[in-house]
Amino acid sequence: MSEQSPDSSRRRSRFRWLHHAFHRSPAGRGWRRGSEFELMHRALGFAALGFLTLVPLLIVVAAADPVNRHGFAQWLAEGLGVSATSRDEVLDLFAPPRRSLETTTAFGLATLALFGLTFCGVVQTGYEKVWELPPGRWHTAWRHLVWLIVLIAYLLLSSHLGPGPTRVAVAVVATVLFFWWSQRLLLGGRISWGALLPGALATGVGLWGLRIFSRLVFSPLIASSAVSYGPVGTVLVVQSWLVGVGFVVFGGALVGRLLHEEYLRLVTWRRKRRRLERSGGP
């Protein structure tokens, strides 16, 4: 067998060094956490269950909004940030608000609320997996109802904001506060407010990044899919957007935990360095 060339050995050595450096870096730890957490799998579950359980409830709630009578389709179009043409396709996908109210019974509304609580449980489980916490006890299920009510209020507030820079500022602050509080509530206060703040900030930034991405990608995709596949094409794009929302919600929490741990490592390193300097060590 021929001996390997020095250049080949150096390349393998450099590759091993880069692999080891990445493995020990914050990015490497984040990659491993995301793989162990099965981030994409949970985002797909978030989108599927959200579309089946939460969206029907929001359709009825939006139809009953006395201020904004455009219904849930208008909410969704605003969230997607789509163009006027794509907005029409989204509006055509759902029944008019008045029809939604006329065909909804008290039993149907109670069933929709129960389904919405199931979705809240999925979000709570995701946050618990991010922080490697045991499942919450059954008597804390009231938190799901509180979270669902505040979620609806948050969406109502977002739909009533007027255009302009003020809307962007208020929406960003409201998003960060909502997800900061959501983690604290659904985790049952087992993680401190300070540790949860980076995750809320990462989620807020990620959702606004998703909005920009939606305007650039999903908006023309809705128009082309509607022509090619009809309403089914629009549904597929909306589902893809919900996958992105789930990815950002859980991914933001993962990034937040990683940032918090890196901050703690930095604080520990600085304290050790100060102690060494005071003791006259190297």
Can you say where each PLM-predicted feature lies in the sequence?
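Membrane-embedded alpha-helices and immediately adjacent juxtamembrane helical segments
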Residues: 1-282
